[in-house]
Amino acid sequence: MNIYSLFVVAIALSLDAFGVALSIGLDSCVKRKNKLLFAISFGFFQFLCTFIGAYSGFLFNTYITYVPQIIGGMIIAFVGAFMIKEGFDNKEEKLLLNFKMYFVLGISVSIDAAVVGFTMFNKISSNYVILGDSVFIGIVTLILSIIAFIISRYLKRIQLVCKYADYIGGIILVIFGLKMMFF
């Protein structure tokens, strides 16, 4: 696979992480450190899932085509529903700031990378090429997640967005989850 094709695949895979990062970034309780940890989590799990998928793709390719998207979509929609609920509750403790969420969201936005690894990278014979391609995808996801957090910082300056950030972020996550499950 040439670098252009790999870059297009990396962008496509990282769009879910971009949308989730944008939604998380709208929450005023999420600090810079949390945003960086989410971006690292998204990039790492994108790399890891692609890498694992490439090695196990030939075994599971026929059986697991739609299941990861449904599971990932359900998790993201579930987190979105909790964000909307937290908007109504106005609690100080946020679900997003729970340490487990770095893993839950990181894995849920990266499940499709495992499917890509199953289908596209399972025919690559060199372990170094698989590792390099997987690292590249992880780095692109990390960078796009950081860009999403930067964009969300400017979106929060809009009074309407700031006032309804939990609801907007939650609705976006629910929509992303539904998109992953059904489209």
UniProtKB/Swiss-Prot annotation:
The GO molecular function terms of this record are: manganese ion transmembrane transporter activity
Keywords of the record, alphabetical order, are: Cell membrane, Ion transport, Manganese, Membrane, Transmembrane, Transmembrane helix, Transport
Provide the function of this protein: Probably functions as a manganese efflux pump.
UniProt-listed Pfam families: Mntp
Task: List the InterPro entries.
Answer: Mntp/YtaF (IPR003810), Put_MntP (IPR022929)
Q: What is its main location?
A: membrane
Protein name per Swiss-Prot or TrEMBL? Putative manganese efflux pump MntP
Q: Which family does it belong to?
A: Belongs to the MntP (TC 9.B.29) family.
Q: Which organism is it from?
A: Clostridium acetobutylicum (strain ATCC 824 / DSM 792 / JCM 1419 / IAM 19013 / LMG 5710 / NBRC 13948 / NRRL B-527 / VKM B-1787 / 2291 / W)
- Which regions span the lipid bilayer? 6-26, 36-56, 64-84, 101-121, 130-150, 158-178
Which compartment or compartments is the protein found in? Answer: Cell membrane
How would you describe this protein's topology in the membrane? Multi-pass membrane protein
Cellular component terms, GO, for this chain's entry?
plasma membrane
